[in-house]
């Protein structure tokens, strides 16, 4: 992308500016991001209803349970692929909308498709690496497993930003992801850890809000543990479906935004360290200011009205 530096998230960050940029970008474009995420979450939430997990609770034979789980493999794979596709679309929209006024969600859906197959292949490879890293981490006790999980999570933030912003192929994406993630490694690990903790807290609180209208059903179950019918049918309740989709829509854009923040931070630091010299009329060498910092733009003011999506 030639105009990558025009993106409002492109700059060198510290932890304070990174979190402020995350909140400002999210707040400034909340309506568009929420509506897009609501549609995506609604589709994914409805897809989970098609997988009849509650029938597992009526089966006591382990062999039958395994047979049931095998029958769920294809629907679960379709669900995972749909989740990766929605993630690809969201990343493309967040990258291009702030610097291209003609961009909308429908264009994003079409143009993001060219990244989906390479991303799908990368995620299969990445999943194998993640399992290996976490298993190896287990041998270094519980702390090792946590560190490995955080490391894998940190790497995942760079994959789509690198692929989309640099038009990289699979091999280039792997190479650039490793390079940018390990440039400022401890800062990236620290920021990712803070993000994961905040994301977890927000998700738990919002999930509690979703369950408030159904507190009566839980109270009945606590009073009579043998009667779980009200809880079992909860995922099929239209109100629960809508509230769950709305809550997921609130948190869905956070990960892509944060991914672009740490990517652009690494990219800006990388470019500022690669100082280019140009000759003047007297043959002398001078450093250009624009080689050190991204050009300041009015668009970097996050308090402006959100772009229409």
What do the predicted segments below correspond to?
Residues 8-28, 104-113, 170-183:
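A short amphipathic helical element positioned immediately N-terminal to and/or at the very start
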Residues 44-80, 130-150, 203-252:
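Membrane-helix interface segments in multi-pass membrane proteins
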Residues 110-130:
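A conserved helix-loop-strand patch within extracytoplasmic ligand-binding domains
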Residues 33-35, 73-77, 120-124, 189-190, ...:
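Hydrophobic alpha-helical transmembrane segments
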Residues 57, 88-114:
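Hydrophobic transmembrane alpha-helix segments characteristic of membrane transport
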Residues 32-52, 81-82, 126-129, 190-207:
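Hydrophobic alpha-helical transmembrane segments of multi-pass membrane transport/permease proteins
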